[in-house]
From Swiss-Prot:
Gene3D superfamilies: Glutamyl-tRNA reductase, N-terminal domain, NAD(P)-binding Rossmann-like Domain. This is Glutamyl-tRNA reductase. Signal peptide: none annotated. During catalysis, the active site Cys acts as a nucleophile attacking the alpha-carbonyl group of tRNA-bound glutamate with the formation of a thioester intermediate between enzyme and glutamate, and the concomitant release of tRNA(Glu). The thioester intermediate is finally reduced by direct hydride transfer from NADPH, to form the product GSA.
Amino acid sequence: MHISVVGLSHRTAPVEIRERLSIPEQTMETSLQSLRGNEQVLEASILSTCNRLEIYTLVRNPDLGVSAVSDFLSSHSGLETGELTPHLFSYHHEDAVDHLMRVAAGLDSLVLGEGQILSQVKKMMRLGQEHKSLGPILNRLLTQAVTTGKRVRSETNLGTGAVSISSAAVELAQLKLGQSRGLDHLVTLESEQIAVVGAGRMSRLLLQHLQAKGASGVVLLNRTVERAEQLSADFPDLPVQCRPLTDLDQYLSTCSLMFTSTAADDPIIDAARLAPLNRRSKLRLIDIGVPRNIAADAADVNGVESHDVDDLQEVVARNQEARQAMAREAEQLLQQEAQQFLEWWDSLEAVPTINQLRSSMESIRTEELQKALSRMGPDFSARERKVVEALSKGIINKILHTPVTQLRAPQTRQDRQQALRIVERLFDLEAS
């Protein structure tokens, strides 16, 4: 069995490719069932975010497993395999484990050290458990990854002032506003007329960072006003006006800055919608949705400046050097957690031999116990029989304790295999 990961991210694919592979939560069960339906895939889990899609699997054969996952991605996205392959990466065994640890720690994120990815890894594990696509191996791996993410954020400086896609989006707005005034620094958003489209987790973070950056008020548009009102109630110090999404055109006409973060499958804003508005002032659109909420042609409309998640690189580059130094603190911790999982994984190789050894000893114990009890005659009480049986079990457990502990102990694969072969020969066990 082999652990593998196949995926793509902001490092390997542009947003127009990533959005076609995005897997929303409502189709996660079907996707996991499709993967598990392949005979090569024993366990599966999917991580789908705005910046990455990664499929972790336990497979019989790594090459055939990668092929199975690639075929699934091609079918899901409608992209030919040849068109998709240049954007995919794959890692196996130790490399796959190391990669997941880095992802959970935020070291592979667009915004280095961002905190939201850990919640997304937790969600990946929860959905895998709910839809019964996880087995003991991936469940243990994901648990270890969550532990890693928590330790990095609590034990290193990378967790200090951690940022997110939403905070980077707000910072991008500040940067672009400053550049429009001939300034090379971030400016306050106090005078901007701001709208946020969507009322999910990303929008919650947007409101949080807009408030911190001086926004004087925000219009929150959502399909259901009730959900927007529930969200706005968590920000009593930020004036939030909740409106239905049907009012979108009105605010496209009047606001100066709009953020979009909805779960829509198709763009909700495009050139055809913007062109008739005849705006006289600049409209800045910042889209952090994947799939994109704003079509690429929106930027072709006069007076409209449009940005998507790939444009956040400009903001990230401004503080990446400092966060890289913090990331180096986390590397040793990551290696510890990865090694701990790999030692557990390698120890599983000994389980069949240990089970055979226990079974063999139990057969001998039972056989010899029956011989002894038959010699005791009818005067041997039931209580005395139980004492003798417990004694025989205790002796076997004491004898097996040290060899079983040694077989499970951390060691090189070569040393473990040599020890297993010796035990199998000494006790006439079948080779595992």
